[in-house]
């Protein structure tokens, strides 16, 4: 009888370990990152800020990323912003304005485009670089991941990410401040094949209870794997990012 009990206990322990392994939050988040973008790539984006009266302001950006925490951006449109560039190295961010002629430090919660998307959204690193998974729930065809910022320098203290279980792509993300206040909700949609094994949402929409009636949309295009020289991701290269295109 005691042998049977020990056997049942062992079976239950094994089943628990198997269940935990099946919903390994860290592995899920890393796969989400891999499915959204390669480790090193270039892409184009259109950003659309929509005001309560329906008026819009649009931006077109070229972006390049190398490794886990190096990223540059180049404004192509509108003409008033064309030539401006951005650089992110880890938690540090800069904006280069041709008329100023030197890089200016900016923060993750500011926005170089105005509207709801902040600099952390525009120059987003892999989620697994900035957040750790604190809980995972299986909810039908989705996973619900609770994420906690690894450092105080991260724009959002906590994220709730709903992930499509089959595609391992994000569906929605709720971003919270340390106080528990909801800052914004991000919604991914319109999954497209960008080629070379990259299949991901082409549209990201956001709204915020802090900006009632305002919306913002990010459209992704021409995502391609590409490697760059290390000098591209330096302050001295910010005035030359246009040479990458």
Question: What is each PLM-predicted segment?
Answer:
Residues 62-64, 84-88, 159-161, 218:
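Broad, structure-driven detector of short, well-ordered beta-strand segments within folded domains
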Residues 22-40, 46-48, 55-57, 80-157, ...:
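Flexible, processing/modification-adjacent segments and terminal tails
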Residues 7-17:
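Bacterial N-terminal signal peptides
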Residues 72-81:
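N-terminal post-signal-peptidase region of extra-cytosolic proteins
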Residues 140-235:
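Gly/Pro-enriched, hydrophobic low-complexity segments
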Residues 1-6:
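Positively charged n-region of N-terminal signal peptides that target proteins for export
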């Amino acid at each position: 009888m005691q042998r049977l009990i020990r056997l049942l206990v062992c079976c239950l322990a094994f089943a628990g370990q198997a269940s935990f392994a099946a919903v390994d939050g860290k592995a899920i988040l890393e796969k989400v990152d891999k499915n959204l973008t390669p480790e090193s790539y270039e892409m184009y984006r259109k950003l659309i800020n929509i005001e309560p009266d329906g008026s819009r302001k649009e931006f077109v950006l070229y972006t390049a990323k190398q490794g886990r925490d190096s990223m540059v951006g180049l404004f192509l449109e509108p003409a008033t912003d064309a030539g401006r560039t951005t650089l992110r190295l880890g938690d540090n961010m800069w904006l280069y304005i041709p008329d100023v002629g030197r890089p200016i430090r900016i923060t993750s919660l500011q926005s170089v485009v105005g509207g709801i998307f902040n600099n952390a959204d525009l120059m987003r690193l892999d989620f697994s670089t900035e957040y750790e998974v604190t809980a995972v729930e299986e909810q039908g065809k989705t996973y619900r991941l609770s994420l906690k910022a690894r450092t105080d320098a991260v724009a959002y203290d906590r994220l709730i990410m709903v992930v499509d279980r089959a595609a391992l792509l994000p569906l929605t993300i709720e971003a919270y401040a340390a106080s528990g206040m909801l800052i914004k909700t991000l919604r991914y949609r319109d999954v497209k094949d960008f080629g070379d094994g990259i299949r991901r949402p082409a549209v990201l929409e956001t709204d915020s209870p802090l900006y009632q009636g305002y919306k913002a949309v990010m459209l992704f295009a021409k995502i391609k794997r590409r490697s760059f020289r290390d000098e591209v991701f330096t302050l001295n290269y910010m005035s030359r990012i246009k040479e990458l295109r």
